[in-house]
């Protein structure tokens, strides 16, 4: 770790992700000499390529603005780089390296031929007109296009990048290259997208949690759930949980948290979708419309059976974990990327709370992106039912892999299981493909 820290000084998010993985992987490597011989861990924590570029664009007043763009192409041992683009003021190299590193393991768990990467910009779409967002997206992809391709690197959406932004970037890519290909996923259904893609991460989160609960002799039926966030992952985690008989009582955004003790039903969820996806409003407007409680902060002090953190990294700390456990929470399934701090994770595990780590529980989105890539290659569209079944099968297989590598007596360490299962496939591929040992000059 000292070498990693010296090479990545000040990159706290990335170092946190590497440390959490290393704590699980190092003992496994010590028991498997081939990974030591090939120095796999040191190779794995170094991105294959990091691209940083400026993104100039013109605002509606005619002024030239400049943002910074990134693409971290982390590992391509098992397939083309795959991972989202995030547009948010908090974006920096550390965050994207952490996300790209996590993506390597997550993509490996899906069993699809997908490498890992991540990208984005410190551009903030909030408060920008549609024309400004379009001009930024076009400028961003005008540089990025030379580094991506259907068999090289296939970006998707993330925070701040939805179907609108993917459309603007895909259109510009097509103009530049004169090519219609599956270079981006999250596309509109009429121009190469896949059904279930918007729902996939949320649905996948619930499918994984359902498998975890079933193994422990529990179900979603009748359970009270608290959810943080109010974007796609939160919305569709809620939708699938309601379908399985659970009662969801909270949503949140950066302004605060709503608590609806009567439960968020299908009608209320449709209101949230319109509020957040179309009107781009604040969640406190829900509290006004449905006369329920709104407060600043997060929902982790609320009494619940299951917690689904679906907002952002490190949103749930040790004190939050203690509150959840004392309030009777039996399971936590991560929808966001690294939403729980290390202390919180340790507390859940020591308290025998079922804890699903993001590498496994959040893999539904990239799995369905992989299915979109397959449909693009085949020049065909699968039905909603076909995609949903394939997604569910993938999540059940991920759960089985986590159980295989994480079983400890009668219990399952899902952190250990997810990390080792994801590691083995990538590490073995890296060994099989060799390294350049010498250069021959003619």
Go through the PLM ranges and name each one.
Residues 98, 152-156, 180-184, 227, ...:
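General beta-strand structural signal in soluble alpha/beta enzymes
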Residues 307, 440-442:
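Conserved small/polar residues in nucleotide/adenosyl-binding loops
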Residues 35-63:
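Structured beta-strand/loop patches that form or line metal/cofactor-binding pockets in enzymes
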Residues 188, 193-303:
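Glycine-rich phosphate/diphosphate-binding loop of Rossmann-like nucleotide-binding domains
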Residues 88, 107-220:
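Glycine/serine-rich phosphate-binding loop and adjoining beta1-alpha1 elements at the start
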């Amino acid at each position: 770790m000292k070498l990693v820290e010296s090479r990545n000084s000040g990159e706290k998010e990335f170092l946190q992700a590497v440390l959490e993985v290393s704590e699980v992987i190092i003992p496994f490597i010590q028991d498997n000499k081939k990974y030591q011989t090939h120095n796999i861990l040191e190779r794995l924590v170094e991105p294959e390529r990091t691209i940083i570029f400026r993104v100039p664009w013109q605002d509606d007043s005619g002024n030239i603005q400049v943002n910074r763009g990134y693409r971290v192409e982390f590992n391509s041992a098992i397939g083309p780089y795959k991972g989202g683009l995030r547009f948010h003021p908090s974006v920096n190299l550390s965050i994207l390296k952490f996300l790209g590193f996590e993506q390597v393991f997550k993509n490996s768990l899906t069993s699809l031929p997908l490498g890992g990467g991540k990208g984005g910009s410190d551009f903030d779409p909030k408060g920008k007109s549609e024309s400004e967002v379009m001009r930024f997206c076009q400028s961003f992809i005008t540089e990025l296009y030379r580094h991506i391709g259907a068999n090289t690197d296939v970006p998707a959406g993330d925070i701040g990048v939805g179907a609108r932004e993917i459309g603007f970037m895909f259109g510009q890519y097509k103009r530049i290259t004169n090519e219609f290909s599956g270079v981006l996923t999250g596309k509109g259904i009429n121009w190469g997208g896949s059904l279930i893609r918007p729902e996939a991460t949320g649905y996948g989160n619930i499918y994984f949690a359902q498998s975890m609960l079933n193994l422990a002799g529990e179900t979603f039926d009748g359970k009270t759930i608290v959810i943080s966030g109010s974007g796609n992952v939160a919305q569709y985690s809620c939708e699938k949980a309601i379908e399985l008989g659970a009662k969801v009582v909270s949503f949140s955004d950066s302004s605060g948290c709503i608590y609806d003790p009567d439960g968020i039903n299908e009608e209320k969820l449709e209101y949230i979708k319109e509020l957040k996806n179309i009107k781009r409003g604040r969640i406190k407007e829900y509290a006004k419309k449905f006369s329920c409680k709104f407060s600043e902060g997060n929902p982790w002090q609320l009494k619940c059976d299951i917690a689904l953190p679906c907002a952002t990294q490190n949103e749930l700390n040790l004190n939050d974990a203690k509150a959840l456990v004392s309030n009777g929470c039996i399971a936590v399934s991560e929808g966001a990327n690294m939403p729980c701090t290390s202390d919180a994770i340790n507390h859940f595990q020591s308290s025998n709370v079922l804890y699903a780590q993001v590498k496994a529980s959040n893999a539904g989105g990239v799995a369905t992106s992989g299915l979109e890539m397959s449909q693009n290659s085949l020049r065909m569209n699968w039905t909603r039912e076909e995609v949903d079944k394939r997604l569910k099968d993938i999540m059940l297989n991920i759960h089985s892999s986590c159980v295989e590598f994480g079983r400890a007596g009668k219990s399952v360490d899902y952190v250990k299981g997810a990390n080792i299962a994801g590691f083995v496939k990538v590490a073995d591929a890296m060994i099989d493909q060799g390294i350049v040992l010498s250069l021959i000059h003619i």
